[in-house]
Amino acid sequence: MTRMVNCVKMEQELEGLDFPPFPGDLGQKIYENVSKEAWKQWLAQQTILINEYRLSSLDPKAQNFLKEEMQKFLFGGEDLEMPEEFQAID
């Protein structure tokens, strides 16, 4: 049976994640309030941020930056602006 959540990002009831994306309170909050679709969108946005800003997942500053951006993206009710250097491939 598919688990449904009232997704805060998409503002509708959608299929939820299968498990919290990481441990702790924030992971549980995401599990309870974010759909698979919204999480997929965040992962795409995160990839752009990592590539455009040349972030290292081992750098604590980069980890904090991504965590803040994730919270804005998922719970802030706003889409994030793309980095200035970003050029979408058509």
From Swiss-Prot:
It comes from the Bacteria. Signal peptide: none annotated. It holds the Pfam family Iron_traffic. GO terms for molecular function: iron ion binding. The keyword Protease does not apply. HAMAP family: Fe_traffic_YggX. This is Probable Fe(2+)-trafficking protein. It comes from Hydrogenovibrio crunogenus (strain DSM 25203 / XCL-2). The lineage of its organism: Bacteria, Pseudomonadati, Pseudomonadota, Gammaproteobacteria, Thiotrichales.
